[in-house]
Amino acid sequence: MRNPVPRIAAIHDMSGFGRTSLTVAIPILSCMGIQVCPMPTAVLSTHTVEFTDYTLCDLTPELGGILDHWERLGLHFDGVYSGFMASPEQMDSAARCIRNCLAP
């Protein structure tokens, strides 16, 4: 049985300052009646457009474990939303999520 509430995986960063990233995507998509399941790619002190000496905590090493857990739970998503990727390897994690976690 499918979840009656649309569910998406949101693969994106979390910026501490600035109206960007998961801080914006989660409330907007939630107001649209969508269950947002974040897979954070990085935590930044600010967004990267206006600021240059921001801090960045790359979460690439965590993404595989997140996906392993989601797959063990049998989670499926109606869509995958992606944003800022902190490393090229994160594209592989996004592709894996699309391949293995999209609802049939």
Question: Positions of the model-derived regions?
Answer:
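Ribokinase/PfkB-type carbohydrate-kinase core domain
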Residues: 2-18, 24-104
